[in-house]
Regions:
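Extended beta-strand/beta-hairpin segments
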Residues: 1-52, 59-140
């Protein structure tokens, strides 16, 4: 792979700590979610950050496919739901559901565009055959 961009973020304190990008743009406290034993859900957590990255990246890939196909699709929207759970071997794993809305086109065209985006999105390529990713497509 020819690297086009690299970023760097440092974490201290694990799930109950702090993350900061080298350029200082991203800097926030992270905490364990309540459902995993944390105090509350008032902070960001690793799953939330993963969901944000995947949603933004997938939406960019989708818009690239829309431009390439010269589709008449309207403004797209991607909602990423990221779950964490225990695996059979005692470790932990993630699962993702991407709810993707592609307005202004038929459902068939929307599904085709989403499948194309899923093939080029870096997050999709990184997760393929590693975690379950479910794509739910709407066109309203």
């Amino acid at each position: 792979m020819k690297t086009l961009y690299t970023t760097s973020v440092t974490a201290t304190g694990g799930r109950d700590g702090h993350v900061k990008s080298d350029n200082g743009i991203l800097e926030l406290d992270v905490r364990t979610p309540k459902s995993l034993g944390g105090q509350n859900d008032d902070y960001a957590n690793p799953e939330m950050l993963f969901a944000a990255g995947y949603a933004a990246c997938f939406d960019s890939a989708l818009n690239l496919m829309i431009r390439k196909s010269k589709s008449a699709a309207g403004e797209t929207k991607v909602n990423a739901k990221v779950g964490i759970g225990q695996t059979e071997n005692g470790g932990f794993g993630l699962e993702v559901e991407l709810d993707v809305n592609v307005p202004g086109v038929s459902l068939e065209e929307a599904q085709s565009l989403v499948e194309q985006a899923h093939q080029v999105c870096p997050y999709s390529n990184a997760t393929r055959n590693n975690i379950d990713v479910t794509l739910k497509v709407t066109n309203n």
